[in-house]
Amino acid sequence: MARRDGRTGQRSVWMMLAATVALALVLAACGSDGESTTADSTETTVEEGSILFNPENRKVSLTIGSKNFPEQEILGEIYAQALAAAGYKVKTALNLGSETIARKAVKTGQISAYPEYASTALTSFFGFKPEEVPSNAEAAQSKANIEFLKEGLQTFNPTPFASANAVGTTREIAEKYDLKTISDLKGVSKKLSLYGSPECRQRIDCLAGLEQLYGLKFKSFTPVDIGLRYSVLEKGQADLSILFTTDPQLAAESDKFVLLKDDKKVFPAGNVIFVHKRATAWEAGSGLELTVQAVQEGLTLKLMQELNARVELEKETPEEAARAYLESGGYIAS
C-alpha cells in the first residue's frame, strides 16, 4: 500500500493545527518542555520538534505499556517520547509480558495504552480464524476496533508496516529435509523440535494452527523466551523456531536462517494499532490521536526492520532507537 513519507505526512497533520496552537508554541519557546518517565523513574527531556507542545496536555498523565520483545518496546518508546513532546506527563511500563497480560493491564487501568497487532487481537482475543482476518490493514483495524469497543477500549488507525509469525530454521536443516514451505514439514515434523513463546501453544496463529490447519505433529514443542528464538537455532537446541517477519536477522544473516513459506495462510500479517481506553482518549483530547498518527506514518516495514536491528543486533536500547527515529523524522529536535 502506498504511503506518504513519514516526515512530510506527519508535518502536514500538525500544520493544520498551527493556528489553534499558536499560544502553545509561544509557551514552548519560553522554556516549557515535556518529560517521559520510564518505569524505573528515569526522566527523559524531549526537545521541541515538529510535534507541538501544548501546555494544556500537562494536566493528563499517561502510562504507555508494551509486550515483552524488542519491537514492542521500541514502539512503546516511540509513543511515549512523542506524547511527552506534545506535553503529556508520560510514564512507561514496557516488557509487561504476553498480549493477554498487556490487554488485562489496559483494561484494569494499570497502563493507558499499548501497541498491539490487529491480527493478534482478532485471532487471540476475539476468536477469529486466520482466514477471517482481512488482508487490508484498515479493514482489520476496523474489525478489531468493533470488538475492543465492547470492552471499553478503542484503537487508532494502523501503522504502515505489518508483522507476522513465521516458522524459521537453519539453512542446514532446510536443505537436509528439502524444506521450502510449511507444508513440506508434513512428512518430517515428527522428527523435528519446535521452539516458540509460551503463549504459542494455544494460539491459532502459532502451534495450534500448525497442528490443526497443517496437520503437523512435532517431536516436541518447547516454550522459550522470545529473545532466544534465534540462539536456540544457532546452538542446535531447536530444529524449528517461531520467528517474526520483521526480524532484522533474516536480512543480516540470510546465509544462516530460512523462513518457510506459509502456504496455507495460518499466520496473518498484522499492522500495529494503538489500544487504549475510551476514557483515556476523552481525557487526553485530540492531541493523543494526532500525535500517535503522526509518528506512525514513517513506520514502514524497512524502517521497522532497521529499528529492530539497532536494538537486537547493534545493542542500542529501545529508548535510544526510538529517539533516533523521532529525531531523524523531525518529530522532536536532535
Question: Which stretches of residues belong to each language-model region?
Answer:
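C-terminal motif of bacterial Sec signal peptides marking the signal peptidase cleavage site
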Residues: 25-29
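Bacterial lipoprotein signal-peptidase II cleavage site
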Residues: 31-40
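Extracytoplasmic "Venus flytrap"
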Residues: 43-77, 94-98, 199-202
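Short helices/loops that flank or line small-molecule/ion binding pockets
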Residues: 77-82, 100-111, 127, 208-213, ...
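Short helix-initiation/N-cap motifs at beta->coil->alpha
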Residues: 92-104, 198, 219-231
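A ligand-binding cleft/hinge motif common to bilobed small-molecule-binding domains
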Residues: 118-129, 140-144, 232-259
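A conserved helix-loop-strand patch within extracytoplasmic ligand-binding domains
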Residues: 134-194, 278-279, 297-301
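Periplasmic-binding protein-like
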Residues: 152-154, 159-164, 248-295
